[in-house]
UniProtKB/Swiss-Prot annotation:
GO CC terms, sorted: ciliary transition zone; cytoplasm; cytoskeleton; membrane
Organism field: Danio rerio (Zebrafish)
Gene Ontology process terms (BP): cilium assembly; convergent extension involved in gastrulation; non-motile cilium assembly; photoreceptor cell outer segment organization
Signal sequence, renumbered to the chain: none
Presence of keyword Transmembrane: yes
Pfam families listed in its UniProt record: Transmemb_17 (PF09799)
Listed name of the protein: Transmembrane protein 216
Phenotype of null mutants: Ciliary phenotypes such as pericardial effusion, hydrocephalic brain, curved or kinked tail, gastrulation defects and other severe defects in left/right axis.
Gene: tmem216
């Protein structure tokens, strides 16, 4: 009877720290994966809100045309970088690859710089933009800390 209970205990994946098909521990960071998922949805809403705010600024405010074009091009660049960052972070965490996760952390730097640009350095910064970018920078801070911790865990593990 004790042998059956022992087998049932380790048959449940949430009670064991080992991978299903092997005996290697699962090192992926669940909080980091949750942050990647939430940040993906948040950035999609952020992108739509920024586009709508640029339309508002272009129509209502005396926004210089050259600055508006520059800000929209930077937003498109920001979107591409964020997509790459989330992809490499997502795959690096789930596949337990420190190089892909390092690329994600490296791409985090230009994304944070672009977020600071939209937070402080535009011609007109709306309050909504300030709040949205401040929340995005909080996401980046948490992802940086968890990403560096996860990279160190992956680097110390003996995965063959």
């Amino acid at each position: 009877m004790a042998d059956v209970c022992l087998r049932l205990q380790y048959a449940c994946p949430w009670q064991s720290n080992m991978a299903a098909h092997g005996r290697q521990p699962v090192l992926s960071s669940t909080p980091l994966q949750i942050l990647f998922h939430l940040n993906g949805w948040y950035f999609a809403a952020f992108f739509v809100a920024e586009i709508l705010m640029f339309i508002y600024k272009g129509v209502i405010l005396p926004y210089p045309q050259d600055n508006l074009i520059l800000d929209v091009v930077l937003l498109l660049l920001f979107s591409g970088l964020e997509t790459l960052r989330l992809f490499y972070g997502w795959k690096g965490n789930l596949c337990q690859r420190s190089l892909a996760l390092f690329v994600s952390v490296a791409i985090l730097v230009p994304c944070a710089v672009l977020s600071v640009y939209y937070l402080l350095l535009q011609t007109f910064v709306l309050r909504l933009e300030f709040v949205l970018n401040a929340v995005l920078l909080c996401f980046y801070g948490f992802e940086l800390v968890l990403g560096v911790m996860t990279i160190s865990i992956f680097s110390r593990a003996n995965i063959y």
